[in-house]
């Protein structure tokens, strides 16, 4: 790991990782115009059907919550050339469903759940590209509060070396804690045998746009420290901001 502008490097303040398991279902259904998702009737139809499926999943004893998200914005990221060289499809997921289970072992029982199977079929029959992975939590600032009317981040990290992503993330997350008052963040690491297009996926939230977006657009150290360290360590960071499906 190489740290650029190391005088700015402060590690994030972390809690002990959670024992929860995570099932992430991400779908690219509509198109994008720059950083914004274009209106798409197929996306609207899918969103109308996802809510009842999430409710059915949430009623399981081994499921802590099942939450659906719709994309609203792609903030500045890093690594488009790296993705192109590696032949990796860029993350353009406009719908995400995140299922949190009581433990990692509980994820196996979800594979045959009828609501999960219906959800997968719905996304695969409608989406241009679907990414599904089961994951554990290697690190967290705090559990992400899905009950709040917040702006939710999923950042899809690609790198050949997962440990490098984790090491760099500790410092970039520290920057976000200090510069944007980041209240929560939970890393998801694909389990052995699961699709690992993304070495790690970071999930986080902020209470409002003004708490984080101005820093991404106007604070110089976002580019000279955060994006520069991703670039120096050959990490493709692909952040997308979502709103929770009500």
Locations of the language-model features?
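Short S/T/G/P-rich N-terminal loop/turn motif that feeds into the first structured element of a domain
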Residues: 1-94, 102-109, 126-246
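Ligand-binding face of N-terminal immunoglobulin V-set domains in extracellular IgSF glycoproteins
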Residues: 112
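Conserved CoA-thioester-binding segment of acyl-CoA-metabolizing enzymes
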Residues: 115
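Short basic (Lys/Arg) and small-residue
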Residues: 118
């Amino acid at each position: 790991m190489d740290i650029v502008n190391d005088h700015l490097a402060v590690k994030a303040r972390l809690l002990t990782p959670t024992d929860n398991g995570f099932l992430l279902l991400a779908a690219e259904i509509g198109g994008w115009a720059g950083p914004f998702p274009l209106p798409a009737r197929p996306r609207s139809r899918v969103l109308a059907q996802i809510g009842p499926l999430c409710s059915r999943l949430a009623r399981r004893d081994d499921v802590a919550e099942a939450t659906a998200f719709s994309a609203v914005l792609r903030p500045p990221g890093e690594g488009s050339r790296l993705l192109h060289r590696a032949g990796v499809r860029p993350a353009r997921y406009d719908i995400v469903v995140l299922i949190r289970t009581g433990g990692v072992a509980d994820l196996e029982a979800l594979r045959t759940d009828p609501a999960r199977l219906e959800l997968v079929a719905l996304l695969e029959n409608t989406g241009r590209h679907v990414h599904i992975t089961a994951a554990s939590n290697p690190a967290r600032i705090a559990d992400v509060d899905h009950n709040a009317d917040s702006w939710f981040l999923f950042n899809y990290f690609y790198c050949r070396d997962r440990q490098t992503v984790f090491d760099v993330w500790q410092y970039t997350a520290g920057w976000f804690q200090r510069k944007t008052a980041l209240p929560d963040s939970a890393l998801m690491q694909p389990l052995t045998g699961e699709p690992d297009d993304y070495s790690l996926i970071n999930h986080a939230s902020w209470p409002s746009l003004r708490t984080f977006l101005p820093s991404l657009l106007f604070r110089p150290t976002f580019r000279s420290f955060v994006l520069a360290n991703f670039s120096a360590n050959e990490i493709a960071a692909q952040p997308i901001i979502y709103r929770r499906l009500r």
